[in-house]
From Swiss-Prot:
Coiled coil segments of this chain: none
Function (record text): Component of the yop secretion machinery.
Name of the gene this protein is made from: yscO
The protein's name in its UniProt record: Yop proteins translocation protein O
UniProt similarity note: Belongs to the SpaM family.
InterPro entries for the chain: Flag_assembly_chemotaxis_eff, T3SS_YscO
Residues in the signal sequence: none
Lineage: Bacteria, Pseudomonadati, Pseudomonadota, Gammaproteobacteria, Enterobacterales
Top-rank taxon: Bacteria
Keywords annotated in UniProt: Plasmid, Virulence
UniProt region (Disordered), positions on chain: 132-154
Amino acid sequence: MIRRLHRVKVLRVERAEKAIKTQQACLQAAHRRHQEAVQTSQDYHLWRIDEEQRLFDQRKNTTLNCKDLEKWQRQIASLREKEANYELECAKLLERLANERERLTLCQKMLQQARHKENKFLELVRREDEDELNQQHYQEEQEQEEFLQHHRNA
């Protein structure tokens, strides 16, 4: 019975180890996605600054009417809104990354608990083996004693 329970504990340790490997892969993927998003955001930021400068230089020595000024302002606003969306995506991915780290920590705690329980049952199995061996020695001694008693009386 104890051996079967120990086997269950071993399986739980194996399952917890597998969960950690899976979670580590998820964490690495989340980290990679976040890094890519940060790089995209940084690249876009630099491009946006250059693009705003280019648009400004185009209009620098020209007379702007209200319609052209509004169009230019909309272009700039659109560029900045897109940059804000990139930054928002980075923030969301950073939050997901933190969640994946928390899940990994939880998996590690579960593995630690599973190993602790497995070790307890391993000790119980060891004690049971020891008790069985002692019982076997005792039984052998009893049989030997009976044999000697029987031959003395005969």
